[in-house]
A protein has these predicted regions:
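Iron-sulfur cluster-binding electron-transfer modules in prokaryotic oxidoreductases
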Residues: 1-168
C-alpha cells in the first residue's frame, strides 16, 4: 500500500471482538478526517512483544524480522498504532533489527485531528456526549512507558464529556 500511513491494528484490534469494534471505529474516523492510510492485512503478524516479554527471543525475532521486511517492502514510513504494546515494540525494539518507522499512537493522532478541525468535537457537530462524566484509565504502556496522558483526555473532552480523574 502506498499511503502516508500504515494502520497497524495489532492482534487485539484484529482478533478480539470488542477491539475489532475499536478498529472499525478508528478506520471510520480516519476516513472521515481524510487521512491517507493503508492496511497491510493478513501479511501483518503479531508484533512479538508478548513473546519477548515471556522470554521467547527466537519467536520475537522471527515475528519482528518478518514484519520489518513486510513494512519495508511496502515502503512504510509512518505507522498508526492502536495497541500500546505494538507501539512499544515498533518504536523501541524494532530499530535494533533495522526497523525504523515513525510510530504514531492513535490517541495522539485523534487529538491532532480534532485540534486541526479535521474531526469535529461534539460542540461543532451539534452532538451530545453519550456520557456526561468519564474516567479514563491510562494503560501502562501508553501512560507510564510512552508518557501519553493528555491526548486521550483531550479526545474525551472533545466528545463533550467531563474527564474525572480516579483516586490513586
Amino acid at each position: 500500500p502506498q499511503a502516508e500511513y500504515v494502520y497497524w491494528p495489532g492482534c487485539s484490534g484484529a482478533y478480539d471482538a470488542r477491539n475489532r469494534k475499536v478498529s472499525r471505529a478508528l478506520v471510520a474516523l480516519l476516513r472521515h478526517a481524510g487521512v491517507d492510510f493503508a492496511v497491510i492485512g493478513p501479511e501483518e503478524k503479531c508484533c512479538g512483544d508478548a513473546a519477548r516479554r515471556m522470554g521467547n527471543e527466537f519467536l520475537y525475532y522471527q515475528l519482528a524480522t518478518e514484519n520489518i521486511e513486510t513494512l519495508n517492502a511496502y515502503g512504510a514510513k509512518k505507522i498508526i498504532v492502536q495497541c500500546p504494546h505494538c507501539a512499544q515494540a515498533l518504536e523501541r525494539d524494532y530499530p535494533q533489527l533495522g526497523g525504523r518507522f515513525e510510530v504514531v499512537r492513535h490517541a495522539q493522532l485523534l487529538e491532532r485531528l480534532v485540534a486541526e478541525g479535521r474531526l469535529p468535537g461534539a460542540e461543532r457537530a451539534g452532538a451530545q456526549a453519550a456520557f456526561e462524566r468519564v474516567t479514563y484509565h491510562d494503560s501502562c504502556y501508553l501512560g507510564r512507558y510512552a508518557d501519553v496522558y493528555d491526548e486521550p483526555r483531550a479526545v474525551v473532552k472533545a466528545c463533550g464529556a467531563q474527564v474525572v480523574e480516579m483516586e490513586r
